[in-house]
Amino acid sequence: MEHQFTVPAIKQAYSDDFTRFGRPGVVGYWFEMDHPYEGHRNFADTNDIYLNTYNWRRILRPNTTVIDIGGHSGDTAVPMGAMTGGTVLTVECNPVVRPWLEFACQMNRHLAKYIVAHEAVTTEDNVMVTFSDHGNQMCNGGLVDHSWGIGAGNNSIQVPGVTLETLCRRYLTSEEINRIDLIKIDTEGHDCLILDSSREFIDSLRPTIIIEWFSSFDNAQAEAMFEIIASLDYVALYPKNFKFADATEPSEDLLLIHRSKLDDFLR
């Protein structure tokens, strides 16, 4: 069957063999954006960082569903699909970078079932929210909601927003929802607010969760983040070494494990 694709402007195309990560014969492809504010990244090195340094190869499990919120150019979605072979729902509300994500998912459809969603994931359904860049011509950015108190940069657009549960039910089958095993959230400081507003849905699945420790958080915001994590009955670990995380010792990301699954995870 013939397929036609729109090819975005690409600076460099890469392939990587995932045999060294325990997936013999699995080859994935990633395409570096030709954008003035996109720094150079080698695909193999990026995979090594995610899968080895951040231990994703110990977290991603075969034939599961992964939710990738903040998909950008596909640098996280591709290794997620390569390692699971299941379903990857990757979410990118920024229309400037989404063509690279869509192209990467099309070129890697032999790895997994990829679904690209265009909505922002927010704390309530059917809202319009502002996406603003970091002064980088929409290469990256985050949501601006003045009730959340976090802003971004120079260029802004309005994007539709839905809750995590609504997003999953909109794009996934019931079987795929039941197989959700990992949720990665990178929403520039709103990660725990999204979890807090989706606590019943999260508790029904109790997946592993990866969130960003937003670099602009002050001590009070970090404490509030840890309070939300604890209220969800999750435990925060540092992904590089699986040690218990502390609100006074920042990390780029946090790995969240439901308390009922912690002993099995650490065993």
What are these model-derived regions, one by one?
Residues G71-S73, P95, T123, T187-G189, ...:
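Short, glycine/acidic-enriched loop or turn micro-motifs at the edges of active sites
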Residues G86, T90, L167-R267:
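Conserved acidic-Pro-Pro-aromatic motif
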Residues D75, P99, D125-N126, L193, ...:
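Residues that form or flank phosphate/diphosphate-binding pockets in enzymes
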Residues M80, L101, F131, I194-S198:
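Hydrophobic packing residues within well-ordered alpha-helices of enzyme cores
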